[in-house]
Amino acid sequence: MARAMIGGMLEKGIAKPEEILGSAKTQATLDAVSEKYGICVSGSNREIAEKADILILAVKPQMLAGVIEEIRDGVRQDELILSIAAGKTIAWIEEALGGNLKVVRCMPNTPAMVGEGCSGVCRNERVSDEEMERCMTLARSFGMAQEIPEKLIDAVGAVSGSSPAFVFMFMEALADAGVKAGMTRSQAYRFTAQAVLGSAKLMLATGKHPGELKDMVCSPGGTTIEGVQALEEMGLRASVMKAVDVCVEKTRKL
């Protein structure tokens, strides 16, 4: 995810390579990122905390406590802290860093890797509107971003953050069905991906309810409604809702 954020910032001209300083767990990763993006790198998280205007904590929630232990004494009260770690609340981050800090949380998703991400962003009361707009501009560099209250961020993380995995499972199954019906594997993947992409664009462009768009495809007595009935009988909706429920529950335990 950090690479997607770096790529978006550079592509949209939000920052120059020399204005970005990054760290990683391994020297190999540092070398690869430096070579690809031309950014500055450091083996010290503390150094980055001391120098940053916006300190981006682009680590998994299980790693965040260890990173904070390294940077706590280097964080300044005038810098923005932007965390993408799921489940770690603003209050948790403030307490862990031991100060009255400006904290923003951002929940992006993997489509950010191709500039089509979807991010929910929230802040504490110390972050000004101008500072929040800087963070929103950053988030928009790799997709859509919307400010939300923190109480919704776990739901957003499940609906937009985890859902690409669910969509890919659906696409894989759809492609397998196409192969079973005689399509080549490459054909099945291509047609499936385009169908999902086009459907998403249609929903965004028209603003229509997904149920209405579904009904537009289902002709009376036609083939599609037969498939819809099969999905209903197998509990598609309930399965999807349950998947989101358990994702939210797990996030709150992190």
Residue ranges and their predicted role:
Residues M1-K36, C40-G43, E50, V179-K180:
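NAD(P)+-binding Rossmann beta1-loop-alpha1 motif at the extreme N-terminus of oxidoreductases
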Residues M5-I6, I71, L174:
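Hydrophobic residues within alpha-helices
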Residues I20, L30, I48, T184-F191, ...:
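Small-residue helix-packing motif on alpha-helices
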Residues Q27-A28, Y37, N45-V121, E125:
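Rossmann-like NAD(P)(H) cofactor-binding subdomain of soluble oxidoreductases
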Residues W92-K102, C118-A155, F168-A205:
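Internal alpha-helical scaffold of NAD(P)-dependent oxidoreductase catalytic cores
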Residues V156-A165, S186, K214:
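A short glycine-threonine-serine/GTX helix/turn-capping micro-motif
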Residues A193-L254:
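NAD(P)-dependent Rossmann-like dehydrogenase/reductase catalytic/cofactor-binding core
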